[in-house]
């Protein structure tokens, strides 16, 4: 593992690391914020998954999360959004290929060789973080847009792994919207039954009551993708039918940008702290 950057930040450290991923068959970069140590108790971790076109640095530089994370004593881990490199399959579109991994395990050539972001986030990256940093095994997960989709499916597919989950403007029903249909048909093939295991709404309908965890979703009502790509009301209906403890907040005037995330990230960190720090 190689440190690329380190910066003092709110009495903690903002770092960027590169490591060779055996899951993705390429070098990967992640960012991590280490809050100032408090006592001898290892701090919990919040994983943040970013959206289309992003890498590990967007949240780090734009969301302004470090101040509150330092206050609460929460480690922030920001992975990249896809495998990277000249040998990694790519596409000219912004919504496919590098920068658009959709946090799933691809089954179709040429994508299946590298595009296993789900396995990377479930197994390899947490194991690496646990082995290299002084952190507890308590963790939560959050994300934006494609990353909100990623956070929700990670939580729904892994009962007991996360204390809580949150999302900003998530793609909740990828099986039914253009971004998801394009990605799933490319990465997973044309069998739409195979798509369902990567769809938050389908996973929530299939969930067990004892596996429900506290869930917070914020959505701006001035988001240009709200009607066509995001459709949070579909997940809210699934949550209602399953009595899943989910809060959906519609935020007037906010769009899809990091200005929206920066406005409400403190709420999300304090939401997760209620459960992470128990």
UniProtKB/Swiss-Prot annotation:
- Supply the PANTHER family for this chain: S-FORMYLGLUTATHIONE HYDROLASE (PTHR10061), S-FORMYLGLUTATHIONE HYDROLASE YEIG (PTHR10061:SF1)
Organism superkingdom: Bacteria
Q: What does this protein do?
A: Serine hydrolase involved in the detoxification of formaldehyde. Hydrolyzes S-formylglutathione to glutathione and formate.
Against Pfam families, the record matches this protein to: Esterase (PF00756)
Q: Which EC numbers characterise this protein's activity in its record?
A: 3.1.2.12
The scientific name of the source species is Escherichia coli O6:K15:H31 (strain 536 / UPEC)
Q: Which gene encodes it?
A: yeiG
Q: Which reaction does it catalyse?
A: S-formylglutathione + H2O = formate + glutathione + H(+)
| Entry keyword annotation includes Signal | no
What are its GO biological-process terms?
formaldehyde catabolic process
GO MF annotation, one: S-formylglutathione hydrolase activity
* Record InterPro entries: AB_hydrolase_fold, Esterase-like, S-formylglutathione_hydrol
Keyword Hydrolase in record: yes
Q: Which Gene3D superfamilies match?
A: alpha/beta hydrolase
How is this protein named in the record?
S-formylglutathione hydrolase YeiG
The active site consists of 145, 223, 256
Question: What family does this chain come from, according to its entry?
Answer: Belongs to the esterase D family.
Arranged from A to Z, the UniProt key words for this protein are: Hydrolase, Serine esterase
**One Gene Ontology cellular component:** cytosol
Upper lineage: Bacteria, Pseudomonadati, Pseudomonadota, Gammaproteobacteria, Enterobacterales
């Amino acid at each position: 593992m190689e440190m690329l950057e380190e910066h003092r930040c709110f009495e903690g450290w903002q770092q960027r690391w590169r490591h060779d991923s055996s899951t993705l068959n390429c070098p990967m970069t992640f960012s991590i914020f280490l809050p100032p140590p408090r006592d001898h108790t290892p701090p919990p971790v919040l994983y943040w998954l970013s959206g289309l076109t992003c890498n590990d640095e967007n949240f780090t530089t734009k969301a302004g999360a470090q101040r509150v994370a330092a206050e609460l004593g929460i480690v922030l881990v920001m992975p990249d959004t896809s495998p990277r490199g000249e040998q990694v399959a790519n596409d000219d579109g912004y919504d496919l290929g590098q920068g658009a991994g959709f946090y799933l395990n691809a089954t179709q050539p040429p994508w299946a060789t590298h595009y296993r972001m789900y396995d990377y986030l479930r197994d390899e990256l947490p194991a690496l973080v646990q082995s290299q940093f002084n952190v507890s095994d308590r963790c939560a997960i959050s994300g934006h847009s494609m990353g909100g989709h990623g956070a929700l499916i990670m939580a729904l597919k892994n009962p007991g792994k996360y204390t809580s989950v949150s999302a900003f403007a998530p793609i909740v029903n990828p099986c039914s919207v253009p971004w998801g249909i394009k990605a799933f048909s490319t990465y997973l093939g044309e069998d739409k039954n195979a798509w369902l295991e990567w769809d938050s709404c389908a996973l929530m309908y299939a969930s067990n009551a004892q596996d429900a965890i506290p869930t917070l979703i914020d959505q701006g009502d001035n988001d240009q993708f709200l009607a066509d790509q995001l459709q949070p009301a579909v997940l809210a209906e699934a949550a209602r039918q399953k009595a899943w403890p989910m809060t959906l907040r519609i935020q007037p005037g906010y769009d899809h940008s990091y200005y929206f995330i920066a406005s409400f990230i403190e709420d999300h960190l304090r939401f997760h702290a209620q459960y992470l720090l128990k």
